[in-house]
Swiss-Prot record:
Main location: other
Listed name of the protein: Translational regulator orb2
Pfam families according to UniProt: CEBP_ZZ, RRM_7
Oligomer status and interactors: Monomer. Upon neuronal stimulation, forms stable amyloid-like oligomers composed of isoform A and isoform B which are required for formation of persistent long-term memory. Isoform A is critical for oligomer formation. Rapidly forms amyloids and toxic intermediates are extremely transient. Unlike in the adult nervous system, remains monomeric in the early embryo. Interacts with the translational regulator bol.
């Protein structure tokens, strides 16, 4: 701490002292440090306190003491910098627009080293409060001086290395030209030295070193060319306080580091830029662009604390007092920062980010790009997250909104078949690709295709003739072997192709109308009748809402009678809307053709939702054209041990019975079932038995 005792004179004489000192006068002011993102010096603060003494007279030679925490700078250096700052307009003050009136109000200016006094070259003790007002009014005006003094007396902030705003500072003599030139050279020399100090300090302080260092270099070049002193540079924050935008000189705001030795005053009332606490994002702010006034700046999101709001730069992210984790002062918006090129920063995880991303798209915005950008964004996000990830609800929303092929997103996901203990489908080869056959890991569609709306007089041979051009196939329909009929009884049939590539060719030849595929087929009496083609996409067999939850077979239900067009995503949404807590849904498919069998599974994340689902017993599935009543019961496994004896009373065999009553919900061997359910109140419980392994119906395939 440097103590400077100055007699009443035009020249300031410095004297070092380690004791605290007071500034004689009638008004006291307390100072708090305010850092600027464009300031290249270490943040310092000065404290000035007034002693309860009467002001001296005109002839008094009472010395005044000014205490600065200015490191290596002397008062002469500071006074020399006062001259140049008067004629240099400042940008980036609070509330947006020109910051000069606000800065001149307190006689402070940003010269790259901090806010300093403008347009003064001497310090003198003020003989009286009226004379002080008269001396300052010549420069500011009576109203401005009154407002300034009221602000200082009310305990307002006082920026570092600032003499402006004190009641006993007389601002009068204009500087000479040679003094201004000397001031500029000295200022640039000091700025270069302190910038090196800040660079060394940031290596230990800020995790955003590379981005901020790049930012300081850009701002240094702009200051030398005069670009950063644009009078109309927008600033951050709002309100009438001159300290709302403490980031003078940076048009878009920035995340300014605060040294650990400098505490932030608890008296802040407006917007104050804080450094990001905890794990800060890496250097994602490297993209520069030019604003409307031609000054380049980086689109760095600024975290605004308190009740500041309103106008400011486009990069401002307002954070209230809410939030959690290691940064409780951050609002929920922090996890959803996006860089200027539309790439989303990973702050709150994939689901939270994409939910906000898709919400913006649903409100009419472009969501950061078109469908192709959404596609690349999804793939980049999956690559950043790392590891196998399941499809989430936000992913499906992105697929639906972008209008792209869902397989593009699913190619990056691994939703392979789990073990026998998992309720996943045991045949779910979602491995992506652009075609191929079953078994080669690149299939996208089932080789079984539904054809509806056939002419009533069309037979099997005519159907085969109509679709043979796409590849070898077999025509099948329900109960074909028993009926011994050559005509599909209900106007629909299934095409069983030998190769999955034939399905791709069929889809390419179809006509699309309202997301449905049609192809013209002729019969002996009807020419070119449009029939519906409904292929089954393998990706629609599984859907995961919450990839962080492990699937528990004891919290999984079996849904019977599921309509074949119903997808796993649609089943999950229906069950989650009814009971909540759904983390997975799957559609049972046959092991050979991978086509839905008319049943599904839904896994819940909590016991309450599971019990509510099995207690309802029946559910009405309503989705689009689908309106069907389906049965819900516990999902029974055939490889579970008895929960009572753990295989000791049954020779280590798997338990054949499962009690679905909410008072039991356990697996039992035959012995334990008889013992437990002979008790009062349980004699009416009925066991559920796992049916045999899924076996496809034997079809005498003869590829035509």
């Amino acid at each position: 701490m440097d103590s400077l005792k100055l007699p009443k004179a035009n020249s300031a004489t410095s004297s070092a002292s380690g004791s605290n000192s007071n500034l004689s006068g009638s008004t006291s002011a307390s100072a708090s440090a305010a850092t600027s993102p464009t300031s290249s010096g270490t943040a310092v603060g000065g404290i000035l306190s007034g002693a309860p003494k009467s002001p001296p007279g005109l002839g008094s030679s009472t010395p005044i003491s000014v205490r600065f925490n200015a490191n290596e700078e002397s008062l002469d250096d500071i006074l020399q910098s006062f001259h140049h700052s008067k004629h240099s307009p400042s940008g980036g003050a609070s509330g947006g627009g020109d910051a000069s009136p606000t800065s001149n109000l307190l006689g402070m200016k940003n010269n790259g080293l901090g806010l300093v006094v403008g347009n003064c070259d001497s310090l003198s003790s003020s003989p009286s409060q009226p004379q002080m007002h008269a001396g300052s009014a010549s420069l500011f005006g009576n109203d401005e001086v009154s407002l300034r003094n009221n602000f200082m007396q009310a305990g307002g902030f006082f920026n570092r290395k600032s003499c402006g705003g004190l009641p006993n500072l007389n601002l009068n003599k204009p500087p000479q030209l040679h003094q201004q030139q000397h001031q500029q050279q000295h200022q640039q020399h000091q700025q270069h030295q302190q910038q090196q100090q800040l660079h060394q300090h940031q290596q230990q302080l800020s995790p955003n070193l590379s981005a901020l260092h790049h930012h300081h270099q850009q701002q240094q070049q702009l200051r030398e060319s005069g670009g950063s002193h644009s009078p109309s540079s927008p600033g951050g924050g709002g309100g009438g306080s001159p300290y709302n935008g403490s980031q003078a000189g940076c048009s878009s705001g920035g995340i300014s580091p605060i040294p650990p030795q400098m505490g932030v005053s608890p008296k802040y009332r407006r917007s104050i830029s804080f450094p990001i606490k905890g794990n800060s994002p890496t250097a994602i702010y490297g993209n520069m662009h030019m604003d409307g006034m031609g000054s380049g700046h980086m689109n760095i999101p600024t975290l605004s604390i308190g009740n500041g709001g309103g106008g400011g730069s486009t990069g401002m992210v307002s954070a209230g007092a809410t939030g959690g984790g290691d940064a409780p002062y951050l609002g929920n918006s922090y996890g959803n920062m996006m860089t200027s090129n539309g790439q989303m920063h990973h702050g709150g995880g994939l689901d939270n980010s994409l939910c906000d991303y898709m919400r913006n798209m649903s409100l009419g915005g472009n969501g950061g790009g078109d469908g192709s950008n959404s596609m690349s964004l999804m793939q980049d996000r999956m690559r950043v997250m790392g590891g196998p990830k399941h499809l989430s609800e936000a992913d499906a929303m992105a697929i639906a909104a972008s209008g792209n092929d869902p397989s593009v997103y699913l190619n990056a996901l691994k939703m392979g078949s789990p073990s026998r203990l998992s309720p996943h489908s045991p045949h779910s080869p979602i491995q992506g690709g652009n075609g191929g056959n079953v078994g080669d890991g690149t299939a996208r569609f089932s080789r079984k295709v539904f054809v509806g709306g056939l002419p009533p007089d069309i037979d099997e041979d005519e159907i085969t003739t109509s679709f043979r051009r796409f590849g070898p196939l077999v025509v099948d329909w329900p109960h074909k072997a028993e009926s011994k009929s050559y005509f599909p009884p209900k106007g629909y049939a299934f095409l069983l192709f030998q190769d999955e590539s034939s399905v791709q060719q069929l889809i390419d030849s179809c006509i699309t109308d309202e997301d449905k595929l049609y192809l013209c087929v002729s019969s002996p009496t009807i020419k070119d009748k449009a029939v519906q083609i409904r292929p089954w996409r393998l990706a629609d067999a599984d859907y995961v809402l919450d990839a962080t939850m492990s699937l528990d077979p004891r919290k999984t239900v079996f849904v019977g009678g599921v309509p074949r067009p119903l997808k796993a995503f649609e089943l999950a949404m229906i069950m989650d809307r009814l009971y909540g807590g759904v983390c997975y849904a799957g559609i049972d498919t046959d092991p050979e053709l991978k086509y839905p069998k008319g049943a599904g599974r839904v896994a819940f994340s909590n016991q309450q939702s599971y019990i509510a689902a099995i207690s309802a017993r029946f559910v009405q599935l309503q989705h689009g054209d689908i309106d069907k009543r389906v049965e819900v019961k516990p999902y029974v496994l055939d490889d579970q041990m008895c929960d009572e004896c753990e295989g000791q009373r049954c020779g280590g065999k798997f338990a054949p019975f499962f009690c679905a009553n909410v008072t039991c919900l356990q697996y039992y061997c035959e012995h334990c079932w008889a013992v437990i359910h002979s008790r009062p109140g349980r004699e009416y419980h009925k066991p559920l038995v796992k049916e045999g392994a899924d076996r496809p119906r034997a079809v005498p395939f003869r590829w035509c």
